[in-house]
Amino acid sequence: MNTSSTVIKVTGESAANNYDVVVGRGLLGTLPEILGERVRRVLVIHPRALRLTGDTVRDDLESAGFTALTAEIPDAEEGKHIQVAAFCWQVLGQNDFTRSDAIVAVGGGAVTDLAGFVAATWLRGVKVIHMPTSLLGMVDASVGGKTGINTAEGKNLVGAFHPPAAVLADLDTLDTLPRNELISGMAEVVKCGFIADPAILELVEKDFAAVTDPRSETLRELIERAIAVKAKVVSEDLKESGLREILNYGHTLGHAIELVERYSWRHGAAVSVGMMFAAELARSVGRLSDADADRHRSILEGLGLPVTYRRDRWQGLLDGMRRDKKSRGDLLRFVVLDGVAKPGILDVPDTSLLFAAYQEVAS
């Protein structure tokens, strides 16, 4: 087993926004060194399910001389609400956190989204370090500086761009991750393959079992490749003014499914259906070949991810898609493919086109 660490660099609009994503094993103990000497107080934000891990990180920081506290938040999307952010702000205020102090996020993508938002807004910005413990968190949410919380109107509608000081992707944390969470995270991995790195798709197709084995070198390579794709994109376009939109492949319908399901669906499962829909949409307008569209289905189904959704939910999905951040006026905008690793944008003024494409994924 590879015991060394891989460092993937993310560059920002200035040197102050540059940071490293470290992928390896046994990384939890490196946190004190990364925090540095100026930091005195650290708030460790973690979900209920990771109470023991959060306490371990806190104790390690205390042993290293920091004043460390924990803030336990609800699991998954339930933690991404303004009331939860307000609770974290209260903890920071009551313990006199200053701009030279720091927040550490320990958990999946929802935790890094929430913790990043709290860090971006407390005193207009304090240091945050992400320690993702899920596959989805490692390859997507923790990298790129996007933070956000949900509202009743949609997902991630309130947020800020706030790059982390570092990301520690400790592969040891995947050993106890439930298999369905690994499978969900693979949706974001193969997304990176479809939009930018065909080698990801080839690795998946070669051995479907290995890609969901937390101890396999195949999974590690997939994680590093997916992070590298995202790092390259966000280094060129931090604030989603153009290129970064391609990372939303599958997310327009995916976020709408999450909204309709009141976040009971896993993010990766929703994005999987969203990618299948985007492939059918691109096929219907002649931009994606039959072979590439069918490849979506075979890869996603091979991983155990869903590729269909309920036929009777179309109107709710359409309403949800109209709230998508990529929309411009009355135009719905979709990231589509003109081929593998050839992403583009499709503006759709006529919803009948969307309805027809949806029939190909409706069940």
UniProtKB/Swiss-Prot annotation:
Gene Ontology MF terms: 3-dehydroquinate synthase activity; metal ion binding; nucleotide binding
Binding site for NAD(+): 75-80, 109-113, 133-134, 146, 155, 173-176
InterPro entries linked: Dehydroquinate_synthase, DHQ_synth_AroB, DHQ_synth_fam, DHQS/DOIS_N, DHQS_C
Catalytic EC class: lyase
Keyword Transmembrane helix in record: no
Pathway named in the protein's UniProt entry: Metabolic intermediate biosynthesis; chorismate biosynthesis; chorismate from D-erythrose 4-phosphate and phosphoenolpyruvate: step 2/7
GO cellular component: cytoplasm
SUPFAM superfamilies in the record: Dehydroquinate synthase-like
Catalysed transformations (reactions): 7-phospho-2-dehydro-3-deoxy-D-arabino-heptonate = 3-dehydroquinate + phosphate
Binding site for Zn(2+): 188, 251, 267
Disulfide pairings: none
PANTHER family: 3-DEHYDROQUINATE SYNTHASE (PTHR43622), 3-DEHYDROQUINATE SYNTHASE, CHLOROPLASTIC (PTHR43622:SF7)
Function: Catalyzes the conversion of 3-deoxy-D-arabino-heptulosonate 7-phosphate (DAHP) to dehydroquinate (DHQ).
Protein family (similarity comment): Belongs to the sugar phosphate cyclases superfamily. Dehydroquinate synthase family.
Name listed for the protein in its UniProt record: 3-dehydroquinate synthase
Lineage, opening ranks: Bacteria, Bacillati, Actinomycetota, Actinomycetes, Micrococcales
Gene this chain is encoded by: aroB
